[in-house]
């Protein structure tokens, strides 16, 4: 059989592309996925205790894009959910992102207005110009003490690099607040798929024009498969057989525990910002899904360089390697590289969906 498109990867990028091409343009699609499941890192499943958990760590859907929200709403109902995170610093819990409550509790202040907190930040900040790295972007806003307490050690554990070795985009993802808003995100649309991400992907890919091949490296079938075009969402360095060197990624090793408790944590996730703990984060999944159960399942996250590719490591050295691969990819006709791994970019889920929706529209004109 001949396919219109061979799509490598069944995560957000590959699945949205497949659905749009099949349903809107009547294209015949073969998706090839190296794992034994669809949904990429958003994959969720019920553990042995009946708790719906995210196999690759917490994935919280949030977006300001009405187009993205309405598109995904075709495949799922939603549960309203606003994510909250507490930082564990020396056994005490503080809201993250840093806000007025964090500052008041940490420094025994009693600020009641945004201006007071803004003035406080102004009094402790150390001007950095130009902003060259992740240390600069935080110290420039809130000074050394808050940087060292909440950002330095956590970032070093997460990336095994000092913040001054990482692009400003890493720590720049986290806002600094002057109000008491303790939600992790402030996007207009904040929900969780009612029946989980995997069910949403199953509905998305349930189309007679879409065929899925799991447990398969695309390189093992590409010479025997007839297709007109390819959409590649895997690691770009692997596509080119690492000819310019391997692009580094951070991965995560998870340790799982199930405990006899209806609720364990005061927020869905705790970030451990000190040096004492090797893990960076604990997450209690029931708080996201709204499940009612006599037990609760939590994951502990230990960043590592071994395992599945989770996070591209954004710094100048890696960017130079990626640009060589990107230049090479642009020479290829009928192959589209899209997604976090193939663009070596730290996209959120909604950003990937939005990018693919625009890309498929553009390429089908």
Where do the PLM segments sit?
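N-terminal Rossmann-like FAD-binding beta1-loop-alpha1 element of flavoenzymes
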Residues: 3-31, 360
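Structural/interface elements that position substrates and couple domains in central-metabolism enzymes
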Residues: 70-71, 137, 146, 265, ...
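Active-site/ligand-binding neighborhood in enzyme catalytic cores
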Residues: 90-229, 233, 238-240
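Dinucleotide-binding Rossmann-like beta1-alpha1 core, especially the glycine-rich loop
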Residues: 49-123
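C-terminal catalytic lobe of FAD-dependent flavoproteins
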Residues: 312-365
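Glycine-rich FAD pyrophosphate-binding loop
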Residues: 22-48
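Mid-domain catalytic core of redox enzymes
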Residues: 24, 216-328
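Short, solvent-exposed loop/turn segments at secondary-structure junctions
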Residues: 12-13, 36-38, 101, 156, ...
């Amino acid at each position: 059989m001949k396919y219109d498109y061979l799509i490598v990867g069944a995560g957000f990028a590959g699945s949205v592309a497949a659905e749009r091409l099949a349903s809107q343009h009547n294209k015949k699609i073969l998706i090839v996925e190296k794992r034994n499941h669809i949904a990429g890192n958003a994959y969720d499943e019920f553990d042995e205790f009946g708790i719906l958990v995210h196999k690759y760590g917490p994935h919280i859907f949030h977006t300001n894009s009405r187009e993205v929200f309405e598109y995904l709403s075709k495949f799922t109902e939603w549960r309203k959910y606003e994510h909250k995170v507490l930082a564990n610093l020396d056994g005490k819990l503080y809201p993250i992102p840093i806000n007025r409550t964090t500052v008041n509790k940490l420094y025994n202040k009693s600020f009641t207005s945004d201006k007071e907190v803004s003035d406080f930040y102004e009094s402790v900040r150390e001007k950095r110009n130009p902003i060259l790295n992740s240390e600069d972007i935080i110290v420039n806003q809130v000074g050394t003490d808050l940087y060292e307490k909440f950002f330095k050690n956590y970032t070093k554990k997460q990336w095994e690099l000092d913040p001054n070795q990482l692009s400003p985009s890493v720590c720049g993802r986290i806002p600094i607040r002057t109000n008491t808003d303790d939600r992790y995100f402030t996007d207009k649309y904040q929900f969780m798929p009612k029946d989980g991400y995997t069910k949403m992907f199953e509905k998305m890919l349930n189309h007679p024009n879409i065929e899925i091949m799991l447990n398969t490296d695309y390189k093992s079938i590409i010479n025997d498969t007839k297709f007109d075009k390819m959409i590649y969402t895997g690691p770009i360095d692997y596509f080119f057989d690492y000819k310019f060197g391997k692009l580094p990624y951070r991965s995560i090793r998870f340790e799982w525990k199930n405990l006899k408790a209806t609720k364990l944590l005061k927020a869905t996730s705790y970030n451990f910002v000190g040096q004492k703990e090797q893990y960076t984060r604990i997450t209690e999944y029931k708080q996201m899904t709204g499940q009612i159960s006599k037990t609760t399942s939590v994951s502990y996250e230990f960043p590592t360089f071994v395992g599945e590719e989770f996070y591209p490591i954004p710094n100048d050295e890696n960017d130079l390697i990626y640009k060589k691969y990107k230049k090479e990819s642009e020479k290829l006709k009928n192959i589209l590289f899209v997604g976090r791994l193939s663009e070596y970019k730290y996209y959120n889920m909604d950003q990937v969906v939005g990018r693919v929706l625009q890309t498929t529209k553009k390429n089908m004109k």
